[in-house]
């Protein structure tokens, strides 16, 4: 499981990647961890990876494609549209590019460039605040 690799994509169960695992990954040259599931990395492993120069993308951002695609499907259905797979892929690509831009920008605004955990948390919070303000809740 932990042979030499540049990128590790934990995509199975919650907490599958723990501190011992991330230490082994780093020792084997891992530079990027991109979560593809809901919280597959323990907090200790996440903190250790980031403290050791691994670029870490949390699942709340990197795993958003499935939810986004479901929203695109619901949009098609409600409007009685039929998009080609290429059109869906293009829309999804733009959504993911926008997510990256938002989390990267949020991290930079708080002087934590490349800390995508902080960026994702801040960007997510800002999105909720904006929605609440738009609805007059706040």
Summary of predicted features, one role per range:
Residues 3, 19-20, 125, 131:
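Aromatic-enriched hydrophobic runs in primary sequence
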Residues 26-138:
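Adenosine-phosphate binding glycine-rich loop
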Residues 9-11, 36:
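Short, well-ordered coil/turn residues at beta-beta hairpins
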Residues 1-8:
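Conserved small/polar residues in nucleotide/adenosyl-binding loops
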């Amino acid at each position: 499981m932990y042979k030499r690799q540049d990128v590790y994509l934990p995509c199975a169960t919650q907490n599958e990647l723990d501190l011992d695992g991330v230490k082994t990954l780093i020792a084997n040259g891992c530079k990027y961890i991109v979560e593809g599931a809901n919280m597959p990395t323990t907090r200790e492993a996440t903190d250790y990876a980031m403290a050791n120069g691994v670029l870490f993308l949390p699942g709340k951002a990197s795993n958003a494609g499935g939810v986004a695609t479901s929203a695109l499907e619901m949009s098609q259905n409600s409007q009685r549209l039929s998009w080609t797979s290429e059109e869906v892929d293009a829309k999804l690509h733009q959504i993911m590019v926008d997510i990256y831009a938002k989390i990267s920008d949020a991290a930079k605004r708080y002087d934590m460039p490349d800390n995508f955990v902080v960026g994702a948390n801040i960007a997510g919070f800002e999105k909720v605040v904006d929605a609440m303000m738009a609805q007059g809740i706040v």
